[in-house]
């Protein structure tokens, strides 16, 4: 994967070849993500490492090396197993509930179907923010990412709504496009989540609780402290 830190043309726009290269990089990312997630239990690790790669790309203009990515994936597999199982269980229960309501097999009718669909969309938006946050901490610290994302969703509901829209659009496109294109869509979706999250920063109160790094204190998360004027 190439660097995106190329010069722009005289009109202030990037050259179309650079844009095409970025699109190809994201498509490759989606394909690799899908292959790594194929065993199911490695799905969370694959998503987290892909998010970490996009995080590096958007911050530095370069993709992480294959060695660094494989090292991240190896560290993220075991912590990601319960996350993969939980995500699969929640998705399965919501899908079964929506199917039963749509078919009229359970009481509630259209109102219950609409409420359940809204709950599912909201959870998908929250999951999208968790994916963005876990990418910022190396791709494997899901518990810290989940706590921070919950605070961010409550304190910045517009960003939560925006991320919900991204996940809903991605889900719709996944249904409409040919199955072969779904892995490519996965890479674009991760990039879109990062783009929307970076353009709608959380409120200062949430940012002050965000974990900064795990490189000190024996690998435990260190939280940023609000600046004192």
Q: Could you describe each region identified by the protein language model?
A:
Residues 1-116, 124-229:
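Helix-coil boundary and N-terminal low-complexity module in membrane systems
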């Amino acid at each position: 994967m190439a660097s995106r830190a190329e010069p722009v043309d005289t009109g202030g726009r990037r050259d179309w070849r650079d844009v095409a290269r970025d699109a190809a990089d994201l498509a490759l990312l989606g394909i690799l993500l899908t292959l790594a997630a194929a065993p199911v239990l490695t799905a969370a690790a694959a998503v987290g490492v892909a998010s970490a790669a996009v995080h590096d790309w958007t911050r530095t203009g370069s993709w992480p090396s294959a060695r660094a990515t494989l090292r991240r994936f190896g560290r993220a597999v075991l912590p990601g197993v319960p996350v993969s199982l939980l995500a699969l269980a929640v998705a399965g229960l919501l899908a079964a509930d929506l199917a039963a309501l749509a078919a009229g097999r359970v009481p509630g009718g259209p109102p219950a179907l609409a409420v359940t669909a809204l709950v599912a969309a909201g959870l998908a938006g929250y999951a999208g923010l968790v994916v963005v946050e876990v990418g910022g901490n190396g791709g494997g610290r899901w518990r810290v990412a989940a706590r921070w994302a919950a605070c961010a969703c409550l304190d910045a509901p517009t960003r939560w709504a925006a991320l919900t829209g991204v996940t809903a659009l991605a889900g719709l496109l996944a249904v409409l496009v040919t199955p072969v294109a779904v892995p490519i869509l996965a890479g674009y979706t991760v990039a879109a989540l990062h783009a929307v999250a970076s353009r709608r920063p959380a409120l200062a109160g949430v940012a002050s609780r965000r974990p900064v790094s795990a490189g000190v204190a024996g690998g435990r998360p260190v939280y940023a402290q609000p600046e004192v004027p």
